[in-house]
């Protein structure tokens, strides 16, 4: 999926507003995913997936950091996410559908925290960005 200049601008602006809340939003999105799609918990058998868990917060930070890195490398998502793609495809063997589920939960989380900024254009740009990230993360499954 090709990101337009407007998409890139919207993504960078949105990530700028997320600022120091990335880890918090990442954890909240994971909690939403676990609650809405309980089968996703099977990938975290060693985690305490309850609300406020230190393990969920830690993984939420990893998710947020990876997305922040991707947002900073919009012209080279495959390069920026190559190691993460290898990890999820070959070691963790995460079902690709789970990236879409987490993406949806991230969009809901961002919209709930920034309703005034979550315009239809920003929503579309972030959705395209997360779909592009998901595509890159699943590229090594083939």
Swiss-Prot record:
GO molecular function annotations of the record: heme binding; iron ion binding; oxygen binding; oxygen carrier activity
Effect annotated for changing residue 69 to T: In allele chain B(2) and in 1 BALB/C strain sequence
Tissue: Red blood cells.
Outcome reported for the amino acid change (mutating residue 79 to A): In allele chains F and G(2)
Ranges of residues in domain Globin: 2-142
Residues that hold O2 according to the record: 59
Pfam families reported for this sequence: Globin
Record keywords: Acetylation, Heme, Iron, Metal-binding, Oxygen transport, Phosphoprotein, Transport
Protein name: Hemoglobin subunit alpha
Native species: Mus musculus
Phylogenetic lineage: Eukaryota, Metazoa, Chordata, Craniata, Vertebrata
């Amino acid at each position: 999926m090709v990101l337009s200049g407007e998409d890139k601008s919207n993504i960078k602006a949105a990530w700028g507003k997320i600022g120091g809340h990335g880890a918090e939003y990442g954890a909240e999105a994971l909690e939403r995913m676990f609650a809405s799609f309980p089968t996703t918990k099977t990938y975290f058998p060693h985690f305490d997936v309850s609300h406020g868990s230190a393990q969920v917060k830690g993984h939420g930070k990893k998710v947020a950091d990876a997305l922040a890195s991707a947002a900073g490398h919009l012209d080279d998502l495959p390069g920026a996410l190559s190691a993460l793609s290898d990890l999820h495809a070959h070691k963790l063997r995460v079902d690709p559908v789970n990236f879409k589920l987490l993406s949806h939960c991230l969009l809901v989380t961002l919209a709930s925290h920034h309703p005034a900024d979550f315009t239809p254009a920003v929503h579309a740009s972030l959705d395209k960005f997360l779909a592009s990230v998901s595509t890159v993360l699943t590229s090594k499954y083939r």
